[in-house]
Structures are given as C-alpha cells and as structure tokens.
Design a protein with these regions (language model features):
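Substrate-binding/active-site groove segments that recognize
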Residues: 28
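Single conserved hydrophobic/aromatic residue that forms the stacking wall/gate
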Residues: 1-10
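A positional/architectural concept
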Residues: 22-25
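Phosphate-binding core of ATP-grasp and ATP-grasp-like enzymes
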Residues: 18
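Unchanged
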Residues: 32-55, 65-119, 140-148
Length: 148
C-alpha cells in the first residue's frame, strides 16, 4: 500500500479469475518467498507489480485476517513516499493513482477502510485483527481492544 501526498497507488483485482479479491480495490503486495523479510517482500512485490523500486518506505503495522472460509493470513503494512522507475501494467489488476478523498467510495473490504484510516491518521505501529464471516466484517480488534 502506498500513500503519497494526497494520492494512493492501488489496484483493482479484475484480471484474475476466481480471486477472493475480484472486483475490489486493494493495495500492492503479495505472498512471502522463502527467506524473505517483510521489507524484502514489499520491495520485490512492488517492483514485480508496478515496475517501481521503493527508495523511502516505512513499516506501519500488522493485520491479522481471520475468516470462516480460509486459513488465517497476516499482512504487513508499509507506506512509501519515494521510488524510482516507471510504472508498468500489472497482470493481476489495473493500477491507478486514487485521491485519498475518493478511496472510501471504491469497492473494497470493510477492514481495509479501517487500516486506511489508521494509516491516514498516522497512527504509530499497530496490530489490527479483522475477523470475517464470509464477506462481512464481524469483528475488528486494534492493539487488543475491540473497535467493531
């Protein structure tokens, strides 16, 4: 996920069939490869999905996704304000620079709206647990305290 001034670079998952995120706007990122740290992973995934090399980025939080339909997943959140390179098309979805004020109007997971707000408010490093029943956010716990 990249926050840059008043805009954010995210992608619409329209290209992958049978994708859990189909039709939703999500941040840039992916799965760890063997031996990678969170920093290694975000640098590689950003380059693979955008063609950009991050030069100034910050580790912001950890999100735990719990679902009744899938195994638990963990997402490491980063924001970036510096990069080099020229964006290229992504085979996983359409990349776009979206104004922060327009983000909440896009189709996205309800829990994503929570961590986007935390990032925009510059909350210090946080742990967020999001629990879903199907596509519905059932519970959100921020730093051990229930918020939804």
């Amino acid at each position: 996920l990249r926050l840059v001034g008043s805009e954010m670079c995210i992608r619409d998952r329209v290209k992958k069939e049978n994708d859990l995120n189909q039709g939703k706007w999500i941040g840039i990122g992916g799965k760890f490869e063997d031996g990678e740290s969170p920093e290694d992973c975000i640098l590689r995934e950003t380059w693979e999905e955008t063609g950009l090399t991050l030069t100034d980025y910050r580790y912001r939080g950890l999100v735990t996704f719990v679902s009744d339909e899938a195994p638990t997943e963990y997402m490491h959140l980063f924001t970036a304000t510096g990069w080099t390179g020229t964006p290229h098309p992504c085979d996983e979805g359409e990349l776009a620079w979206i104004k922060k004020a327009e983000l909440r109007g896009l189709p996205m997971w309800e829990g994503d709206k929570i961590f986007l707000r935390l990032l925009e408010e510059n909350v210090p490093f946080f742990s967020l647990k999001l629990q879903y029943q199907g596509d519905r956010l059932d519970r959100a716990v921020l730093n051990g305290r229930r918020i939804v």
